[in-house]
Design a protein with these regions (language model features):
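Beta-sheet entry/capping signal
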Residues: 71-72, 137-140, 193-195, 253-255, ...
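Short, low-complexity, charged amphipathic interaction modules
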Residues: 484-527
Length: 527
């Protein structure tokens, strides 16, 4: 019997796993050194006790209504005023929504080294159910994880709906702000279509498991629940790079779920900042056939593959992949490697992955949000004890997303799971200190599941939601009537008429879209 635990993540420079497989007992030995601060444990215990329908807000507050739940933004202490100006369109839009009943819009500054508890205390709040009159429920972090750490984001996300944006230029911030506001203000809607993309590379237990036991059943469950949606599944041989290119270009759904390895690179590799977290597709022949061989970009989808003519506006994507959302400066799992006892540096600095940044700030209108993983993604997200499928967290969150809930509220299911696992892990560790026996397999499972649950983040405004109507993939077109005068004695070739009319209809539709885009461009230049 193979009792090895396999870890996600492929070293794209060597074609090998970033971390070799371990036995449960080896992993349990590592978990025994884990500690959870008492103040954080108290909040985890509170979060575990909360009923799911209350989400993170206090009783009587509708988390789907920004006028009740509130919205705030958190800038780094040294943020340039020009950054605020770049986001002005989004900030003014959210302020108008959050202040409809009471003043529930806030702008904050994060101080270096500040913990979540210190931040809340300084702003008049504390642990527990969110009171939007003190600190809004929806919070958007603006800045890179060196200035506002990932650890602060994950702590804050236990009770609040937190998202982050970080771009390289103010123009990209402005582009994202414009994309969100136009999706919510304009007559904008997408067809109710979702796509599920599941890679299963040869000789690779990780992706074979995620394709068969995460992507496939999740797509089936969603399809059974939402009969007014169209669900397309691309599994195994269908999960190629060319297919993903199509899904992120001219076949873009409203919601996209992918599961694959994320590409990892050694510190110092010139590709790390640009391509870490890129999605390795079915084109890769697996860790046996490709052992010792660098993975070429023809086998993975990176930021460079996002074309300028891609149609991404309104998309919400969920990438289950290592480093899919970002990379920390220090490896949280470096002690999984032989003879390593301390965390070591894996990147020059913590950073947000380039692929989702490119999707969010696309010049033709970007994605509204991308859900992904900071550091490694683990199979324990959907398998318990490596055998029992546990899809309820994914299923519940995706149901809320497809129902039109704000993405931050939908992800509360993941936050609740993290809190529950943290409490369980703390209990097991306490029993160990008291000399009680704890099963090694159980401890290993809880430890990996806890670390995995902590890593899910939202890139984008946590208050965005899908804009769908089920009828068309474009805003409704305003068409003038067209009259064709055909003499009654004209001789028509009926067998050619249908094809001719269809071609004419397509040309008229394309012209109408072009004219509408031109009107919008002229309007923007005038304003």
């Amino acid at each position: 019997m193979n009792d090895l635990l396999y870890f996600n993540g492929i070293n794209a420079s060597t074609g090998e796993y970033l971390t070799p497989p371990l036995r449960a007992e080896e992993l349990a030995q590592l978990a025994r050194g884990e500690t959870i601060p008492p103040t954080q444990l108290l909040e985890f215990q509170w979060r575990k006790q909360q009923a799911q329908d209350h989400l993170g807000v206090k009783e009587g507050v509708d988390a789907n209504d920004l006028a009740q739940a509130g919205w705030g933004v958190i800038f780094a202490h040294d943020a340039d005023a020009a950054l605020h100006d770049a986001l002005r369109e989004l900030l003014e839009h959210r302020k108008a929504q959050a202040n409809q009943i009471k003043d529930r819009y806030r702008e904050y500054t994060y101080r270096p080294g500040e913990s979540k508890n210190l931040f809340l205390t300084r702003n008049g709040a504390g642990p527990g159910a969110v009171d939007p009159d003190k600190v809004p429920y929806y919070l958007l972090i603006v800045g890179d994880p060196e200035r506002i750490p990932y650890s602060f984001q994950s702590e804050l996300d236990v009770a609040y709906a937190v998202g982050r944006i970080h771009f390289d230029t103010n123009a990209e911030y402005a582009q994202y702000a414009q994309s969100v506001v136009r999706a919510e203000r304009d007559d904008f809607s997408l067809a109710k279509r979702a796509a599920f993309f599941g890679v299963a590379n040869p000789d690779d237990p990780n992706t074979q498991s995620s394709a068969e036991r995460l992507v496939k059943p999740l797509a089936e469950k969603m399809s059974a629940q939402k009969n007014d949606w169209t669900f397309d599944s691309y599994l195994v041989k269908g999960a190629t790079k060319s297919k993903l290119e199509g899904l992120l270009k001219n076949e873009t759904p409203a919601f996209l779920f992918t599961a694959s390895h994320g590409a990892g690179f050694e510190i110092g590799d010139a590709r790390q900042f640009k391509q870490q977290g890129a999605l390795i597709c079915q084109d890769w022949d697996g860790p046996v056939a490709m052992k010792g061989k660098p993975i070429p970009q023809t086998m993975y989808y990176a930021m460079d593959d996002v074309t300028g003519d891609a149609h991404l506006h309104g998309l919400i994507a969920f990438h289950f992949a290592c480093f899919g959302a970002g990379t920390p400066k220090y490896d949280e799992y470096s002690h999984l490697k032989a003879n390593v006892r301390e965390r070591f540096q894996i990147a020059p600095s913590s950073f947000v992955a380039k692929l989702p940044k490119k999707l969010l700030a696309h010049p033709k209108g970007g994605a509204l949000a991308v859900i992904g993983h900071v550091d490694r993604a683990w199979g324990s997200s959907f398998l318990w004890n490596a055998a029992v499928e546990q899809l309820s967290t994914f299923e519940s969150a995706l149901t809320r997303v497809l129902n039109g809930s704000p993405i931050g509220a939908a992800m509360e299911y993941f936050n609740a799971r993290y809190a529950e696992l943290a409490v369980s892990l703390s209990s097991d560790l306490e029993n160990l200190k008291l000399g009680k026996k704890v099963d090694a397999q159980q401890l290993a499972n809880i430890w990996t599941a806890n670390n995995d649950a902590r890593g899910y983040v939202i890139l984008g405004d946590p208050a965005v939601r899908l804009r769908v109507n089920g009828k068309t993939s474009h805003p409704p077109l305003e068409r003038e009537s067209l009259t064709l005068n055909i003499p009654s004695d004209a001789k028509l070739h009926v067998d050619k008429l249908d094809a001719t009319l269809e071609k004419l209809e397509n040309q008229i539709s394309e012209l109408a879209v072009t004219l509408k885009e031109l009107r919008a461009a002229i309007k923007n230049s005038d304003s």
